[in-house]
Amino acid sequence: MLKGDDFDRLSALINQTKIQPFLISRLKSGSPRKINEAAYFLGLAKSGAARNILRKKLRSQNASVFLSSALALARLNDIEVVFEIFRNAYRFKFVSKDSLLVIMSEFSSDICEVLLQNLKKEKNALIQSITITLFRHFKYYPAGEIVLKIAVYSQNKEVTIESIKYFTSIEFLKAANALRALINSPKAEIRAEVLKALAVLGDSSFEQRIWDRMYDSEYEVQYNAVTTLMILIPGSEEKISQFAYGNLKDRAAAIVRMVLSERSIKS
Amino acid sequence: MEIISYIVWGFNALILFYFLLICSIYIILNIVAFFKMIRYNRTIKYLDLKRVFKLTNYKAISVIVPAYNEENGIVESLKSLLQLEYPDFQLVVVNDGSTDNTLQKLFENFSIRQVSFTPFYKLKSQQIRSVYMSSEYPNLIVIDKVNGGKADAINAGINLAKSPLIAVIDADSVLERDCLLKIVRPFMEDENVIAVGGTIRIANGSNILHGNIVDVGLSKSWLARFQVVEYLRAFLFGRNGFDVLNGILIISGAFSCFSRDALIKIDGYRAGCIGEDMEIIVRMHRKLRKENPKLRITFIPDPVCWTEAPETFKVLRSQRMRWQKGTVDSILLHKKLFMNPAYGWIGMLVFPYFALFEMLGPVIEIFGYFFFIISFSFGFVTLSFAVAFLTTAILYGVVLSVLSVILEELSFQRYPKLSQLLTLMAAAFLENFGYRQLTTWWRFRGMFEYFTGKRHWGQMEKKGFAK
């Protein structure tokens, strides 16, 4: 995305010269290639004059025209079309979550308010996940409570993990209790993410639960448990050291020894 | 005489049928691959991958580099690998009991220090002597172990790799900077993906600086140029085409990526196997996809990895014979898949294709040439038929190769100069006169050696990339 002087120069070049009508005429053409190129530059230069044509192009049967128009409208920060983009994206098999995320992240943070209102009634896990990722991207604090409700009840791993990352990014301390339950999730990725989050959101009341996770079946979880304990509990390093070198045959202790030896090299 | 005539005619008819069948399969693969490429290019065109990885819940990846006597290139290679673009990756170098100064070079250049270690998994491998970590590059670990071969070294690497995704590369592979971003995407998009392969390209003639391709070129050697066309054909059409059926049966060992859980479930690589890269994929189909047919082994057409092709007949022969032995080994080990409806497309189409055309192809082709000459010499076929048949066969080969070059030009355009394109077109034409027959002969010999008990790897000499 262009910013500063580069943006000013390009914007002036396109919007204040004959380039703009030229690009708009290409946008109206029937050639997907010409439309895509025109949409790209008009979007970069935030040419408001192209808004209505771009909106019509969202209904195009051609996926590349849809994507380039959606991207241009996002750069124009045309928030009214957010849900039209979601709806139309479903028509195309290969419009992935990634493509939608890239487009949505081009809007300004104003998009969060609209997405928050929608999230209250949204049932689609993909849109929930994209929405929460965008909240994290924009560090949008007001969505904390709603996302907390979703995180607790969602059966979708992606949604839960995105929620945990969001809580960590905005340091949403109210989420700590929800994490208490998720620390025993049957999904290892969730357990690992919870432990990472606890390093920011947790307190000493979590100590025993984190120690328990040192005996987890998954390495990532064990690793995160050790590192979180060291961050969260003051003076835990000594206790961890005793555990590591006092139980030479214990597998959890072996992993702790490894983490300690890695840390000593890194420091 | 009449009976002999019938036999010869019958065999010729069989060869003709075989030829028509393989042509039809290639045509279908070409069409399917063409549409897949268009779709893939549209998907990737609007993606700023670095932005995607900043936003999304990506998975960490451990890149395993087995190294045996790599003292000449290991430092440069690792420095290049450490520059890969990925937000969270670990580089695991496995020194597989090198007898040269590979480990010493790592000590000298990467400030590695011994760390306490415990394997997280229990895949079979030779004894690990020590594990080292770099104080300069915190994401670099070095495993020093007793020699056990490539598959064994990879297993040792997996046992100590921290990440849920595992990439395996050859120590002398040259990777594109954003290759990890590209190869991990299928895992992020679909949690049923358990393995991903990418396109391997020939680096001979390209300008490589500090382990990075700075200018793509073509070698002056026609042997290398033929291989460029061969690789384009194999990757752009072959693997792309089979991918649509979820029928990838081989992912190149030069660069492959797996879900660690899948590798652990099938007990890792099979030590001592000749074609370990094919065997592991066939085993994944056999063991994992039978339990869960939704699992996917897929392929991305992006050129992500560059490798050095042999430029001498001796080394090329050794390579092709080894590849053929690997194919035969993998197919015979998993013959249970052959025409087995329990394995879906793999059992009923892809595996039989590999058995019939990739494994037995050289035998049928060599006998075909032999019988054709006999038939012609004894007047069982007319001159006009012989010329028509040979012309069709050769023209068909030319068309396939030229189509690969055109598809490359339409999609990735890695050879932008007109002179390069013309050279590739010429190679696509010329490879059908001698080169193809020669490689068929080597594959035939590879098969012969396999069945007569000579199943060793053979020597693979590489010149190395000069810069």
What is each stretch, according to the model?
Chain A
Residues 4-14, 36-45, 67-78, 87, ...:
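Structural detector for internal amphipathic alpha-helices that build alpha-solenoid repeat scaffolds
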Residues 7, 11-27, 47-58, 79-89, ...:
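Amphipathic alpha-helical scaffolding segments comprising HEAT/armadillo-like alpha-solenoid repeats
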Residues 22-53, 62-68:
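Structured extramembrane domains adjacent to transmembrane segments
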Residues 30-31, 61-65, 92-96, 123-124, ...:
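Short inter-helical turns and helix N-cap capping residues of alpha-solenoid HEAT/ARM repeat scaffolds
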Residues 213, 221-222:
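Extended hydrophobic secondary-structure segments
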Residues 229, 242, 246-250:
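N-terminal cationic amphipathic segment used for targeting or macromolecule association
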